[in-house]
UniProtKB/Swiss-Prot annotation:
Disulfide bonds: none annotated. It comes from the Bacteria. It holds the Pfam family DUF179. Belongs to the UPF0301 (AlgH) family. This is UPF0301 protein YqgE. GO terms for cellular component: cytosol.
Amino acid sequence: MNLQHHFLIAMPALQDPIFRRSVVYICEHNQDGAMGIIVNKPLENLQIEGILEKLKITPEPRDSAIRLDKAVMLGGPLAEDRGFILHTPPSRFASSIRISDNTVITTSRDVLETLGTQQQPSDVLVALGYASWDKGQLEQELLDNAWLTAPADLNILFKTPIAERWREAAKLIGIDILTMPGVAGHA
């Protein structure tokens, strides 16, 4: 089972404050573990324009049609001071890894320098921090009914309003997560 380019959808019983009602986009999953970015937990009072200001990046030439007031996500509990940018191709940046045909993750400053200009990727999600699982840990959490999984959907990843992503991700597999009981049993 490889869950790269899939969503992890927190089950209603998962009460960890960081992962409660979260949708995690899995960037890498292999025999050594998994790494992902939470895509529906906005950081309070932090937008993309705020990140650019802190890093003293001024979009040149600025395209006023491109909004920089999108929320920055809490990507996970690890390395919360590091930026991770999920975006659509191209992956012409210094530190980019292609996750799927339509999704790239970049950690280098050069992608930030394109934000707000015509050179920015068409779809962008900026996060601080990431989530990871050791070898076998994610698989055990799946057996413990902590998560649902669904193939990733770019519309949910980039365009669905943040507050609706948890429910919409579950709908990908035909589940209305808001009607599920708090604890699912094993069959």
